[in-house]
Each structure stands twice: as C-alpha cells, then as structure tokens.
C-alpha cells in the first residue's frame, strides 16, 4: 500500500525589538545569565505587564507579508502551565483571536514549479526562560529569554513531502527577514521549528495519527527528520501496526528520530483572557502605516534582477536568498557597479571567504563602495583578476580604498611597453636554453616565455599587453 505524506509546521520566530514584549529590559541575545531581567521578568508580586507597541508593529508586518487577515480587536490570553523557566506559571499568548489568520505563502520547489502553502494563524506571545543542567548536579534557570517577543506561525497541513517542508521554511525565512522583523538565526534560537507529520492511504480524506518532531536545529535536519519519519511510519503501517501520537526528537548523530514522550491527549492549558493586558483595536490607519514600511520582497527582487539587470534566474535566486547580501548588491549596483561582476564576486570570492572565516557579510570590512572600486580598477587594467583576489582579502579584513591600497602596495599592473620590452629582452638573456629551443622550432617552446615574464614582473604584467609584446619580440627573435 502506498501512503500520502501530510506535514504541517509550527515556527517560532523571535522578533527583533530592542526590549521585551511586556517589560522594558533588553531582548538582546548573548548577554550573561539573567543580565536582561527585571521585576516583571521575575514575576514579583504586584507587577503588571506593559505591551511594547513595536511587537504589535512587527506582528502586523508579518501578517501583511504572509497575506493574512488581521484581527482588529486585539487581546491576549493566559496559557497556564508550570515549568521552572516560567516563573508566573502561565504564558501570555493569544488563543482564539491571533493577530493574523487565513494566510498563504508561495514556495518554489526543486523542479522549478511553485506551490501555495496555507498559513492557519500567526499569534504573538512571550518566550520562556531557559533551563541548563550543570555537571555539579544542579539545574539553573536563565530568564534572559523570558519575555522576549515571539510570533508563532502555524501552517496548514498542506505539505506533501519533506522537500515541500524545506521549501516552505526557506521561503518563510526570506519573507520574515526581508520584512525586517527578525534575523531568523536558528543557531541563536531566533527561529525554531516543530513539525507534525502523518501518513494516510492515497485517496483517504481523514488524516492519520500525527507525530510531532522537535530538536530540529536546521532546515536540513527538518528535512532529514521528516524523511526518516516517512520511512518509519510507512514500515509500521505496512506491517499492520498503528502509529502512536507521540513527540520525537531528531538525533543527528544516528540520523534517526528518538521517542521523547507519548501523548495521551491534548494538553489542557486552561486558556482565558489576560486580565492585566487591556483590549485594544488595530485601526486601518495603523495597518496601512505598517504596509508602507514593508520592502520589496524576494520574489519581486528576483524578477527585477532578471528583467532589468540581465541576471540569470540562478544568480537572482542566490543573491536574494539572504537579505543582507541582496541589500549589499543593491547598494553596489546603485554606485554604478556592473551587476554581473558584482554578482560574480558576491557568489564567488566573497562567499568562499565568509565560509572559510565563519563570518557574515556584516562582520567583515568589505563595503559596496570598495568592491565597486576594485571591480573598476580591474576593468581599467590597473590590476589583474589574479591580483584582485589578494586585494579583496585585504579589503575584507581591513577595509579602505581599493585603488589607494593597490598603489601603496605596489600592485599596479605594468602596461607600459617602454617598461615591458626591456624586461622581455632580459628574460631572453636569462633563459638562453629556451631561446635555443624556440629558434629550433621546438613545439610549445614559446609558451615557456609567458611564465618567465610573469615571474620576472612578479605577476604584475598586464596579461593582454604583455602577451602581445612578447609575441612581437619573439617574432623579431626568430628572424635574427
């Protein structure tokens, strides 16, 4: 029997506001334990939450970017549960009326086709703290993350393969990043994914029993975990067994999903309206203000790069996959940088350097200005493409002007015949055996002189000019 895969994803995204959702403390990642806390985060008696307007701004932008309807009558709810990293014993979230609902996103699949994935809802909530378990036998609670604003985006169960789930996450990350509401860095926990997967016989409308997957710390692991689950569940069903409703985690080392707990039924969080956060209305003017702040999104940028700048579909997709890279490209082209050359550098030498250094484009000293200047001095013959790679590394590490560095470092190409011809004659004098081979008609003997000349000029001879002059002087040599 063949089965149809049914997948839905729940994605938690940390919003990049300066302060938390209900307290004025910093929402910055990476500070010392409990440095970003105050009496609200610790839930001292008598303290009251104060809603950060910037969080609602971000929620509206997310809803608009994901083609969602917006609930204009806004309220929050209490989700009641006890855990050490949740000092209030409840989480302020949204239950029956999320900020956004009934949305969709179009994703591009590996075969070049597109598919529209439905988004059921997007709701705002506060994050919980973090428990760590020490080797000394004690457990510790860090509340830096407590109260950091989240938006949870819940898809419809519209994905029919791990490939589609991967494509959905890729598209969702792009949209959220371009909207400017999160840096969506999975390695820092600002984007977290839970997956729900079930199988059903083809043609059956009723969903099968679902399994929830956690510990999915990369898009690649989401895909691998789902692929494993498809195989595991299919084997159970084909052997006459039944799928249990359970939560499993993906074990990267063993490339398998591991049971965490069996779900006996849906958790009862006893939701009720949050009494300490008043009702408020999102007026049409507020929504339109947020709409005007939304940028051009990846799909539109890709189309423009192809139609207006003459880039290939592949180059356009690569450039727009990351907003930082795309914005860098935009600035470089605005400075009259050649679009194809800038694209080639960003996808080639720049990408290789970032991978080798383990850095992002924001963390190096390269700027659109000095990259465009470097490309210009390649084009005007000041430096060769080979020398340019060394210049780029210097710019990436130290910044500054490309032309200024090249001149100070003595890297300017030698293009003057008055300088090159005496060097060519000296090459002949220093390599008498090669001259004899050339005059005797030995095959490819002339090519050796190219290497000798480049060595003599320390690679600074302009290749086009040097080869032309070398051919000219070799012809004279043969006549003598």
Curated annotation (Swiss-Prot):
Gene3D superfamilies with a match to the protein in the record: 1.10.10.410, GatB domain, N-terminal subdomain
Reaction(s) the record says it catalyses: L-glutamyl-tRNA(Gln) + L-glutamine + ATP + H2O = L-glutaminyl-tRNA(Gln) + L-glutamate + ADP + phosphate + H(+); L-aspartyl-tRNA(Asn) + L-glutamine + ATP + H2O = L-asparaginyl-tRNA(Asn) + L-glutamate + ADP + phosphate + 2 H(+)
Any one GO MF annotation of this record: ATP binding
Broad EC category: ligase
Cross-referenced SUPFAM superfamilies: GatB/YqeY motif, Glutamine synthetase/guanido kinase
Subunit structure, as described in the record: Heterotrimer of A, B and C subunits.
Primary role: Allows the formation of correctly charged Asn-tRNA(Asn) or Gln-tRNA(Gln) through the transamidation of misacylated Asp-tRNA(Asn) or Glu-tRNA(Gln) in organisms which lack either or both of asparaginyl-tRNA or glutaminyl-tRNA synthetases. The reaction takes place in the presence of glutamine and ATP through an activated phospho-Asp-tRNA(Asn) or phospho-Glu-tRNA(Gln).
Family as reported in the entry's similarity comment: Belongs to the GatB/GatE family. GatB subfamily.
Name of the protein this chain belongs to: Aspartyl/glutamyl-tRNA(Asn/Gln) amidotransferase subunit B
Species annotation: Streptococcus pneumoniae serotype 19F (strain G54)
